[in-house]
Structures are given as C-alpha cells and as structure tokens.
Amino acid sequence: MRRLCTIGHTKKPLEHFINLLRQSGVDLVIDVRLNNTSQLAGFSKRDDMAFLLREGFGIEYLHLPELAPTQEMLDDYSTTKDWEMYEAKFRELIVERDMTHLVLDHASDYDTPCLLCSEDDPTKCHRRLLAEALAASLPDLEVLNLR
C-alpha cells in the first residue's frame, strides 16, 4: 500500500462517487462507519455498496466497524459539537484498538485502499484522523482525500 484515499458519500451523486474511486485507482473500499445500513443515499447502504463496487467496478468492499467511533462518542459529539474532545477521544481509540495494524492487516495486499465514511468534508471526520495515524506509521504513504 503506497497510497491511501478517503471519501465521504454525502453530497455526491453516484456517478461522481464512482468516478472519484476509479480515477484514483482505488481497489479496496474500507467502510469505517459504525452504522452503515440506514443512510439516506441508497447506494451507501452496506449491501448495496458491496454489490455495486464488486460487481460493477471490480472494487473490493470491507466493512470494519472496529475503525468507527463508539456510539457514545457519536452521541456526545452530536450533543456538544466539541470537535477537540471528539478528536482526542478518537485518537485514544485508535491506539486502544490498534486500528493502524487492523487496516494494514486487511489492506496490505491492495495498491490503493480507501476509507469510506459519510462526511463529505474530511476535516471533521474520524477517517482523516485514522489516515493521519496510518501516515505517521508509514512515512512513504500518500494520503488523498477525494472530494
């Protein structure tokens, strides 16, 4: 793995979403959402996403909820809107769950895996924090946030 992409499905029509993945050479999408079955966009639901990516475009799909924040963290952030507190807690969770090794265990055989979440903007999304942790452990890793 020399490159890691991140993407959020919100605010993206299906065609744009797929084009971003294909143009970036993504060969594995790792779904880092805790809840991935009740999203508004039909294509973003777990089973639909897996079928679409694999059958339509030859992109593997893997849901790893271990890479998501806890429900308590999501609820706290929804109430407080305190990004700094959320970020600090999630960075602790990255270490506690050994998330970087979990990603590497699943993605090492792929050229360009992509972390998928719902947030359009990676600035305030846990996928950015996870990508930063991976980049810190792999100095030659290029991270691209697809928008």
Language-model region placement:
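Residues lining hydrophobic/aromatic ligand-binding pockets adjacent to catalytic sites
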Residues: 1-147
